[in-house]
């Protein structure tokens, strides 16, 4: 499997990169992610579980039994790739 194929196994699913892009702004709670992205509840929950299992994000305990999602170092390392894809979108779509 090529390196690109391995990356797409983790990030190629619908909403995955958009979740990472949103979390590059800082930790966010589930409801905030859902509101910002407009993703369906089941889809968002599935993608968050997949990205957590892949080590891209983690659940951050907050006060009063609430949690937020935050990027790991592995997730933060995607900043340049996401910026490049965003620039490509501006230039070519």
Question: Which positions does each model-derived feature cover?
Answer:
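Short beta-strand "wing" residues that participate in macromolecule-binding interfaces
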Residues: 59
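N-terminal helix-turn-helix DNA-binding core of bacterial DNA-binding proteins
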Residues: 2-43
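Glycine-centered, phosphate/nucleic-acid-interacting loop/turn motifs that mediate DNA/RNA or nucleotide
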Residues: 55
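Basic, amphipathic "hinge/linker" alpha-helix immediately C-terminal to the N-terminal HTH DNA-binding motif
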Residues: 12, 63-85
């Amino acid at each position: 499997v090529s390196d690109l194929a391995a990356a797409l196994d983790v990030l190629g699913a619908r909403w995955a990169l958009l979740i990472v892009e949103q979390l590059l702004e800082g930790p966010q709670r589930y409801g905030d992610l859902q509101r910002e992205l407009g993703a369906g509840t089941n889809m968002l929950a599935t993608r968050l579980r997949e990205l957590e299992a892949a080590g891209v994000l983690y659940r951050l305990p907050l006060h009063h039994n609430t949690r937020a999602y935050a990027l790991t170092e592995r997730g933060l390392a995607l900043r340049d790739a996401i910026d490049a894809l965003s620039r490509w979108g501006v230039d070519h779509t």
